[in-house]
Amino acid sequence: MNLNQIHNVYFIGIGGIGMSALARYFKFIGKNVSGYDKTPSILTSELIESGIAIHFEDNIDLIPKDYFVENTLVIITPAVPKSHSEWNYFLEREYHVKKRAEVLGIITKDTFCLAVAGTHGKTTTSSILGHILYESGADVTAFIGGIVENYNSNLIGSGKTVTVVEADEFDRSFLHLYPNIACVTSMDADHLDIYGDDAAIKASFKEFADKVEDKNKLFVINGLPLKGITVGANDDSQFVAHNIRIENGWYIFDVKTPTENIKDLKFGLPGKHNLTNALLALAMARTFGTPTESIAKALASFKGVKRRFSFQIRKPKFVYIDDYAHHPTEINAVHQAVRELYPNEKVLAVFQPHLFSRTKDFANDFAKSLSQFDEILLLDIYPARELPIEGINSGWLLDKVENKNKKLVHKNELIPLLKKSDATVIVTIGAGDIGEMVVNIKKELDEK
């Protein structure tokens, strides 16, 4: 398929974080762009402000008439049900209908692609990498699964020859990509509703890794069962961070690579997982040819990604952090980062589980990760694309949490409880609509 022959791009599910980045991209390169989504959001409002027509009812009559021509590309998200009338209309009339991952595949085939894979850390690592390349003057476009604070966008740059993409393992989407340089951050079990078991996930990551022809351009966290250049901290990795210290809330560290020693790099995101994310981005950028000085400057200026250990309130006696974590390993990483920064403070965690299947598959691990906090408030499960599973609910999960300071709460009870709390650090955690509550939570807690 030749994108140059496409004049119109219509999105079904345009408000998703990945879909909206693609919509911005196609608008930027001069295509006519419009779309449908189920509900209005901050992202859809921003797209409408940029000149993209969006409607919120599954109704063929609301699609602009000039999209009913053969040079229209229709892009769908996996979250859209098969009964969706707009989707079926385009399918039945044999329009070009593609998944988002397939379209990214078409784009990366025609560009130099740097792909970031892994069950955790994709968004932060690809954001750091996109920032490094953009700041160093590369002709790059980075498609990000989150809003990067430096740009207030999920799209970095407008380059035509280099792309940075998140290689998403969900539905084996990353196998559509054509990576020239790639990394794998982690290979923990997830999406068992798709894969069935851990072995199938690992096999899929290996298949992705095999798409990188030159294994000197595949970077893997030390210990993963993949052949590539190893990356780690204080170990025997080929790209290794050492002499790590914290000064005034910043990581300062040295890096030894196969060809050089880099001294006193400065990076502002807390947590050891973020340090290795930065190290992966450094290794990929250095291999791409970015000068060390440019990498160092960009690492120091990187502000982070919204909802990734995002400080909402940072006062001397009270802190509120918001994070997108939705897997036990990610919650552990949030906990580690909080304890590293605030070792003697009382930490309250609010968690909204995401997906019934994920809650069921990892219930014991979720319980262990949540039990580490001083106090836990648990919201109802956010279903996203799923129907309920009998017996799987937040009360069932809470029973497994070994902590006497735990409570099941409804959304309308949350803010009053937080205002009464004596916790000096509050963290909201989850990938569901808890993110839409953050503005109000911040507003109310700012008065504490």
Curated annotation (Swiss-Prot):
Q: Does the keyword ATP-binding apply?
A: yes
Is the keyword Membrane assigned to this protein?
no
Which keywords describe this protein according to UniProt? ATP-binding, Cell cycle, Cell division, Cell shape, Cell wall biogenesis/degradation, Cytoplasm, Ligase, Nucleotide-binding, Peptidoglycan synthesis
Q: Which reaction does it catalyse?
A: UDP-N-acetyl-alpha-D-muramate + L-alanine + ATP = UDP-N-acetyl-alpha-D-muramoyl-L-alanine + ADP + phosphate + H(+)
Q: GO molecular function, one example? A: ATP binding
Instruction: Look up the EC number in the record and give it.
Output: 6.3.2.8
Q: In which pathway does it act?
A: Cell wall biogenesis; peptidoglycan biosynthesis
The record, for Pfam families, names: Mur_ligase (PF01225), Mur_ligase_C (PF02875), Mur_ligase_M (PF08245)
Domain of life, source organism: Bacteria
Q: What GO cellular component entries does it have?
A: cytoplasm
Please give the biological process terms from Gene Ontology that the record holds: cell division; cell wall organization; peptidoglycan biosynthetic process; regulation of cell shape
Positions of ATP binding: 118-124
Compartments, record wording: Cytoplasm
Q: Which family does it belong to?
A: Belongs to the MurCDEF family.
Give the protein's function. Cell wall formation.
The name on file for this protein is UDP-N-acetylmuramate--L-alanine ligase
Q: Which organism is it from?
A: Flavobacterium psychrophilum (strain ATCC 49511 / DSM 21280 / CIP 103535 / JIP02/86)
Gene symbol here is murC
